[in-house]
Design a protein with these regions (language model features):
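A solvent-exposed, charged loop/short amphipathic helix patch at secondary-structure junctions
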Residues: 13-37
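Short beta-strand/loop segment that forms part of the nucleotide-sugar
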Residues: 57-66
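Short catalytic/ligand-binding loop motif for oxyanion handling, primarily in non-cytosolic enzymes
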Residues: 14-18, 67-72, 92-93, 128-132, ...
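GT-A fold catalytic core of metal-dependent nucleotide-sugar glycosyltransferases
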Residues: 67, 109-150
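Long, low-complexity C-terminal extensions of enzymes
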Residues: 3, 230, 234-313
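Active-site-proximal specificity loops/subdomain of glycosyltransferases
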Residues: 37, 69-116
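Long, charge-rich alpha-helical interaction segments
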Residues: 145-226, 230
Length: 313
């Protein structure tokens, strides 16, 4: 079987040194402390990949001079597959753009991880596997399996373009979907873009590397922003649209993921019932929970205890 790796981008936002560097670049920011609170999602993310995706050869965690708590991960799985990758490694040749606090800049250089397999799956640390997964969930017949749906590109919707620009002016985080739409435009899709769901994203290293070889100026522009900017595309989405353009993909035959987008609105009882239904549904293998740190401690404890049981059974 062809080798497949996992890549996760992560930062310990509670680290005072990191916060100091961040503040030096940005200055005052609303809700700063809340933004950087975390609930050790990286432990659950990494552990779930190693447990439920045994075909994964290596798990690369890309971070800024930090390391997650490997002892916590060892409570659930062996850590011999894990490699910690510093930003300095992937920014070799682009050191002038460091430090960066911009996930869209970091993501653009993931293909430069030394020893990375040709095919890899890109995860955020709030994405989890909750049931056994096989390589064919991600790559089938040598093609990436893409999970999402088609939507109209932003260049065909003037009001959305304006709203995205206003967000940038007000320093509100630029639209995630607009960044995917821009990626589609770059790849030659003017009317529709393939909108990704929040689960792992299959990537092909040679496709990304080959594109930047012929478009070095585009890469340097992408790296030039310290923080997310309306003028940036979403890198993994660019890879997806290049795969689609070359008919080198498969659309996921059915949705195997669930998103809990606003967990702050979930009462403990509601979350319990949701997790019970997740266990019953054999088709659902992937879970995304956004902003776990914004909900109640009781709700967080319910989620973690449920996940701990899955990892230890």
């Amino acid at each position: 079987m062809e080798e497949i790796d996992a890549v996760i981008t992560w930062v310990d936002g509670s680290d005072p040194a990191y916060q100091s560097r961040y503040k030096d670049q940005l200055g005052k920011r609303r809700d700063f402390k809340k933004q950087f609170m975390q609930e050790d999602e990286i432990v659950l993310c990494v552990s779930s990949i190693i447990k439920f995706a045994p075909f994964i050869r290596k798990v690369f965690i890309v971070t800024d001079g930090q390391s997650p708590n490997l002892n916590e991960i060892r409570r659930f799985v062996a850590t011999d597959k894990i490699s910690i990758i510093d930003h300095k490694e992937i920014f070799e040749g682009f050191e002038s753009f460091l430090p960066t606090f911009n996930i869209r800049s970091i993501d653009a250089l993931l293909y430069k991880i030394k020893g990375l397999s040709e095919k890899f799956i890109y995860f955020n640390d709030d994405m989890f596997l909750i049931k056994e997964s096989s390589a064919s969930d991600w790559f089938e017949n040598n093609k990436g399996v893409l999970t999402g749906n088609w939507a109209k590109t932003y260049n065909t919707q003037p009001l959305k373009k304006i709203a995205n620009t206003v967000k940038n002016i007000l320093k509100i985080r630029p639209s995630y979907n607009a960044g995917q739409s821009m990626a589609a435009n770059i790849a030659g899709f003017d009317k529709e873009y393939f909108k990704s769901y929040h689960c792992g994203r299959p990537q092909v290293k040679s496709v990304i590397k080959g594109f930047y070889k012929h478009n070095p100026g585009l890469l340097r522009k992408q790296l030039s922003y310290k923080f997310r900017n309306v003028n940036q595309y979403v890198p993994y989405s660019l890879c997806w649209h290049l795969l689609i353009k070359d008919a080198n993909y498969n659309a996921a035959p059915k949705d195997k993921h669930i998103e809990i987008e606003k967990i702050r609105n979930y009462s403990p009882v509601k979350l319990k019932n949701t997790l019970i239904n997740l266990d019953k549904n054999e088709d659902l293998k992937f879970l995304n929970i956004q902003d776990l740190n914004y909900t109640s401690k009781e709700t967080i404890e319910i989620f973690k205890n449920w996940f701990y049981r899955k990892l230890t059974n």
